[in-house]
Amino acid sequence: KEIENKIRLESPDLIITIDSPSFSYRLVNKLQDLRKENVKFFHYVAPTVWAWKKYRAKLFSQLYDKLFTLFKFENKYFIEHNLETHFVGHQIFFDKKVLKKKRIITFLPGSRNIEIKNNLLRLKSVISHTAKAYSDYSIYILTFDHSKSMVKNILKNINVKIITNFDEKQNILSKSFLAIAASGSISLELCKYQVPSIIVYNTHIITRILIKLFVNVRYASIINIHFKKEIIPEYLFEKFTYNNLIKEISILVKNQKKRKKQIEFMNNFSNQMLLKKKNPAEIISDLII
């Protein structure tokens, strides 16, 4: 209500909402009466209707005048509801810098505490094995301040380095030889840095059933979704096992052909995520004016 009142006081000509689809939808829905004053509504970062709740495409299209998308394949879901939709690309790939890889294996168990705990309890034996089997590699766990003590407790007596500082995490990630990461937006950063990866995810059995019932995509990684095939190995739920991961880690450490294949697709994906290699912010600016 406070934001709504502030907007009304400012009397804008244009309102642009960014991401946060539930919040943005509720806010813009309350402000539709401003159309009488010729106020326009634009949104940046489409709701992931291709993954779940496809009906949101119609709802969004009824409220907005323009939509700017990160991924080209998203456009069709909104164009069919007559919303002017523009693919502008993903900002993360505009300043892409690929660094030489070092002997680093990185584990990224997630962002929320419950997610980190669920994934890390499954990964614990894998991390322990990796630290011993690849003793000439540095093993890093990239996490957050809010979960550092929990991570330390779960992984006590295992020879790993736990990093929470943002800049240090980016530095480690960019130089990693291999990453084992929880499903999520981190896959875009791994793609940006061209780090061969394995995607994992574990959750409660009830949540698992709901995901299988309501999620509309076959894959978790955005690269796999984009290319409609498994480029990045995924071990989700019941496939997230010690034996599966130990085998896959061994393949991606030793098999140069497999690593090269991932990197080629990552590079291809990165190039497709920019429109004519232009800064997405500049493209949006041109479309607004």
For the regions a protein language model found, what residue spans apply to each?
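Nucleotide-activated sugar donor-binding and catalytic core shared by glycosyltransferases
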Residues: 1-289
